[in-house]
């Protein structure tokens, strides 16, 4: 990533833009503190001097959305379902479900700025599930967001997962 940006934008970015890139650009969330530390170390090895990685459950009601983002890249965990009383109300407004795969997609919709882009790995069920919650979330993506594409992964890569790409229009 760093090499790509330096190669393609190195002479186009001011010193102030480089400083912002290294100190303010990267934010992440995980419930596992070890994963936060490993991710932080990886980013620092790639010239990101101040990554904002936080240990928190971003779909729980304890998480309050404060910021919105231009770009979201995600491979969230999908552990089945959550207790309804533990789910963030802002996510319940987008999808009425306890399934984590749908809650994370709803979270990404909530976190994107207008015109923002998201690429996330999701189970095939998000695309083909027949429940009311699955259908409503797909309708949200098609009618209120800009769904650029769906990439089906080759067998064994993230089986049975696909990659969902969309841009926020809302």
Predicted regions: what is each one?
Residues 166-170:
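Conserved small/polar residues in nucleotide/adenosyl-binding loops
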Residues 98-158, 162:
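Conserved Class I SAM-dependent methyltransferase catalytic core
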Residues 53, 83, 150-152:
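Residue-level detector of family-conserved "landmark" positions at structurally sensitive sites
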Residues 1-74, 79-81, 90, 98, ...:
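Conserved S-adenosyl-L-methionine
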Residues 94:
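Phosphate-binding chemistry for phosphorylated carbohydrates and sugar-nucleotides
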Residues 65-66, 160-164:
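Short glycine/proline-enriched turns and hinge-like loops at secondary-structure junctions
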Residues 84-87, 132-133:
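Short amphipathic alpha-helical segments
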């Amino acid at each position: 990533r760093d090499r790509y940006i330096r190669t393609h934008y190195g002479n186009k970015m001011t010193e102030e833009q480089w400083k912002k890139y290294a100190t303010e650009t990267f934010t992440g969330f995980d419930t596992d503190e070890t994963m936060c530390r490993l991710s932080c170390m990886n980013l620092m090895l790639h010239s990101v001097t101040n990554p904002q990685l936080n240990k928190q459950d971003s779909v729980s009601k304890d998480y309050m959305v404060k910021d919105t983002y231009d770009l979201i890249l995600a491979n969230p965990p999908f552990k089945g379902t959550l207790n309804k009383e533990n789910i963030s109300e802002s996510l319940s407004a987008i999808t009425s479900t306890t399934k984590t795969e749908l809650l994370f997609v709803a979270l990404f919709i909530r976190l994107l700025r207008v015109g923002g882009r998201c690429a996330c790995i999701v189970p095939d069920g998000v695309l083909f599930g027949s429940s009311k919650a699955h259908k409503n979330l797909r309708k949200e993506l098609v009618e209120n967001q800009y769904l650029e594409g769906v990439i089906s992964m080759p067998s064994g890569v993230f089986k049975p997962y696909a990659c969902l790409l969309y841009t926020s229009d809302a």
